């Protein structure tokens, strides 16, 4: 097999793509299901393709190579009082920037200002013809050309290999405060989520926790404001303000997926608050299944224990009409409702005419 | 062709196919009045099924079509093509669903931008993107051109608020992407479609995210002796860690126009006015306004005017949002530019635009979204003077090249349209252009959807307009 499989520059990545008939770029493989592809596909590691290329704090933007661990970026941003508002997942586990874009995964903080798709500005990527192309821009506002950077969010590397990504960032809030609210079951939790989401409080994160009994609500802003707002929230629902240590434990646990079954399937489901109860009921019938509802009830992460046949989950999600993608473990890649319009094939053909990257079905 | 038009008329009965010259005249131009082109016919569908039938007809007949909302495109995005039809979407105005629990609205493409927020207002929700034309522009047009507005730094552009799109593609295929959830599974098709300038088809039903209206605002207007001082104030605000909802600057000429048009009042003797707006909970705004006011006070303004109530805030915004049309009163014709530069180079960009304007002998008014580096130089000219339009376009071209040189973009929110056709290849190399053309061909193998926008089209270019808008010539509208 031609070498090298660990390109260190965008040009080397393009060369590596060109020298393999079938290829997929992988980062730290924190979402291993996404790179579980047929054996004839060469896996290109982006571990050497790392580093921050440009960071201009006054522009609210940075550009980094695709294999850069998100943790490194978060540290560089924090030194300048900035952050990635979508709360990247698997941060401490080593997730890369490119992997985060291709998987389209955002953490609890995406509730306030949006997810990966809302902060990506530009990319350099290698298409199926082996060409290194720049799309989008490096400024916070740009609408010249087609928005391929957004399209590549959630594209699983099936349309091209990311070399470099430019993101918008925000100044970090002065303070944060987490409340743990009691919610007796899914329906009660859904009511808390929807009421808090529509409130004046401007919550930063709003999650129904995997314990099935509580809602984690995070506020961000000037410290004095958070105290006043939290008193109002605790007058509305029973609960408590968590100490900074407790709060960090909760959010880290969620961000790093430590609540999930080790080795079992982990499935991301796009939902709305009104299906939370139905989703809970559907997964409760699958023995020992765990569920984390994030982003104010807009995404569910379902964790199956290894003994549960994934087809059972797929069947239930399809029954509810919910689209889903498997991130970890042994379950069908598209684990929920799915439509495959003709245009999907035509766009795949346009960007990858020789089928160099895995099919969207693999 | 007459036979084809006859069959077309059957798809939109009751006289909703316009073919008479005086009917076509009203559609010859959009807000980029320097260009005009007369289409073969205007089809006015009343249902999304009729839109699908029209597009399928066009596909079958290889007939080019241009979708049009309110025709407010500043880049000529809805300029008709002479060998095709216009599909006017103004009658598709239903808000099909407004769900305050999920905080979404599902709308037809002809719904006017501000009507969404008006419908959501009883639930204390709103639709965030607010282009200056929000009172008349449609959501379909906003989607096609990924419209911006004054609040993009914090809230993003149209694409950031689109959750789902049902669209008819130029092949006649009807697709549904995304849905009511704020999260997506698989590639972001809605993101790709948004900003495709009508080249990927027509959105039939759009799911918008609604946000809770901010509880409290703090809007400050500050006047400065020089543009540079206003720019420095922006840098200081950005460096402070505050995240304002809006950061806007108007220069002396733009101020003069706003005063004349809407009787806006600004501190006398100012070369620039800065508008900064904080928003959030009352507690957060109370804490942040102290910091903001201190930063502005330290930036040595001639005068600083915080809005004391909602009325004063609206007055500040009215002056800002009327600036384009107000500048129109200063001059018979003008071109609005939409380049973006890195924020730290705003001062340099403005100085060089000023120098170029002086060299060319043209007046340029500047209104811009300082928070995101999005410039809107308005080049004033008199189209009746021989060569004036050409000189203005040459200046506009130099400004765009300047933006590219500085690492920015030729368009922040108006799109490429026909206006910036020549400049897209300056931002993207031949292979990148080829990639985009391959994508376009995937969506539209026949090249019938809004041809000649974003990418040049072989064949007859649009006629260029000199002097008055065709409707003014016809006595239908006037500028007083």
Predicted features along the sequence, with ranges:
Chain A
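A conserved active-site cap/scaffold subdomain adjacent to cofactor or substrate pockets
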Residues: 176, 182-183, 191-243
């Amino acid at each position: 097999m031609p070498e090298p499989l660990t390109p260190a520059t965008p040009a080397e990545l393009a060369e590596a793509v060109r020298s393999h008939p079938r290829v997929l770029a992988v980062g730290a493989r924190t979402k291993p299901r996404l790179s579980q592809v047929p054996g004839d596909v060469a896996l290109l590691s982006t571990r050497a393709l790392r580093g921050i290329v440009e960071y201009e704090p006054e522009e609210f933007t940075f550009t980094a190579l695709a294999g850069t661990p998100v943790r490194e970026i978060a540290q560089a941003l924090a030194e300048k009082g900035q952050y990635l508002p979508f709360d990247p997942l698997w941060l401490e586990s080593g997730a890369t920037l490119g992997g985060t874009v291709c998987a389209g995964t955002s953490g609890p903080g995406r509730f306030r200002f949006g997810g990966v798709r809302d902060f990506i500005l530009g990319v350099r990527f290698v298409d199926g013809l082996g060409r290194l192309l720049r799309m989008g821009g490096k400024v916070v506002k740009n609408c010249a050309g087609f928005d391929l950077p957004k399209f590549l969010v959630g594209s699983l590397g099936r349309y091209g290999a990311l070399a470099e990504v430019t993101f918008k960032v925000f100044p970090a809030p002065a303070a944060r405060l987490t409340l743990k609210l009691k919610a007796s079951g899914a329906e009660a939790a859904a009511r808390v989520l929807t009421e808090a989401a529509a409130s004046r409080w401007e919550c930063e994160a709003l999650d129904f926790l995997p314990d099935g009994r509580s809602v984690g609500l995070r506020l961000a802003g000037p410290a004095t404001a958070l105290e006043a707002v939290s008193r109002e929230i605790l007058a509305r629902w029973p609960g408590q303000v968590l100490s900074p240590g407790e709060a960090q434990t909760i959010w880290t646990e969620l961000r790093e997926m430590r609540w999930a079954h080790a080795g079992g399937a982990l499935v991301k489901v796009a939902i709305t608050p009104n299906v939370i109860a139905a989703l809970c009921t559907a997964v409760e019938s699958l023995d020992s299944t765990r569920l984390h509802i994030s982003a104010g009830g807009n995404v569910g992460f379902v964790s199956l224990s290894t003994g549960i046949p994934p087809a059972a989950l797929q069947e239930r999600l399809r029954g509810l009409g919910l689209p889903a993608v498997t991130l970890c473990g042994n379950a069908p890649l598209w684990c929920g409702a799915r439509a495959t319009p003709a245009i999907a094939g035509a766009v795949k053909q346009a960007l990858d005419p020789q089928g160099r990257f895995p099919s969207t079905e693999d | 062709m007459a036979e084809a038009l006859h069959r077309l008329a059957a798809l939109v009965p009751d006289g909703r196919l316009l073919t008479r010259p005086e009917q076509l005249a009203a559609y010859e131009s959009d807000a980029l009045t320097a260009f005009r082109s007369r289409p073969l016919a205007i089809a006015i569908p009343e249902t999304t099924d009729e839109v699908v039938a029209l597009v399928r007809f066009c596909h079958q007949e290889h007939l080019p079509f241009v979708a049009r909302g309110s025709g407010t495109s500043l880049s000529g995005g809805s300029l008709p093509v002479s060998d095709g039809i216009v599909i006017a979407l103004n009658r598709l105005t239903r808000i099909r669903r407004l769900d305050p629990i999920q905080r979404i609205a599902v709308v037809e493409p002809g719904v006017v931008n501000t009507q969404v927020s008006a419908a959501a207002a009883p639930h204390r929700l709103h639709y965030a993107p607010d282009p200056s034309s929000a009172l008349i522009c449609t959501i379909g047009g906003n989607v096609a051109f990924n419209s911006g507005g004054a609040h993009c730094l914090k809230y993003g552009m149209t694409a950031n608020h689109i959750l789902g799109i049902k669209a008819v593609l130029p092949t006649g295929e009807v697709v549904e992407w995304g849905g009511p959830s704020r999260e997506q599974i698989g590639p972001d098709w809605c993101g790709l479609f948004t900003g495709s300038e009508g080249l990927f088809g027509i959105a039939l039903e759009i799911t918008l995210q609604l946000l809770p209206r901010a509880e409290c605002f703090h809007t400050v207007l500050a006047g400065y002796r020089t543009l540079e001082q206003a720019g420095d104030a922006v840098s200081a605000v950005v460096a402070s860690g505050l995240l304002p909802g809006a950061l806007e600057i108007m220069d002396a000429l733009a101020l003069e126009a706003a005063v004349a048009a809407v009787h806006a009042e600004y501190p006398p003797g100012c070369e620039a006015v800065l508008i900064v707006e904080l928003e959030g909970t009352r507690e957060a705004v109370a804490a942040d306004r102290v910091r903001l006011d201190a930063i502005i006070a330290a930036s040595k303004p001639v005068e600083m005017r915080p809005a004391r109530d909602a009325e004063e805030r609206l007055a500040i915004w009215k002056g800002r949002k009327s600036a384009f049309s107000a500048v129109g009163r200063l001059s018979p014709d003008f071109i609005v530019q939409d380049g973006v530069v890195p924020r730290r180079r705003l001062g340099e960009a403005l100085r060089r635009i000023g120098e170029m304007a002086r060299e060319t002998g043209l007046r340029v008014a500047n209104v811009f979204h300082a928070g995101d580096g999005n410039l809107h130089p308005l080049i004033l000219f008199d189209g009746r003077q021989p060569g004036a339009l050409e000189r203005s376009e040459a200046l506009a071209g130099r400004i765009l090249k300047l933006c590219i040189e500085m690492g920015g973009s030729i368009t922040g929110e108006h799109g490429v349209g026909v206006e910036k056709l020549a400049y897209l290849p300056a931002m993207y190399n031949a292979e990148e252009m080829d990639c985009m053309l391959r994508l376009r061909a995937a969506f539209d193998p026949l090249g019938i959807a809004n041809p000649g926008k974003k990418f040049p089209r072989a064949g007859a270019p649009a006629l260029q307009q000199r002097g008055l808008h065709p409707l003014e010539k016809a006595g239908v509208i006037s500028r007083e």
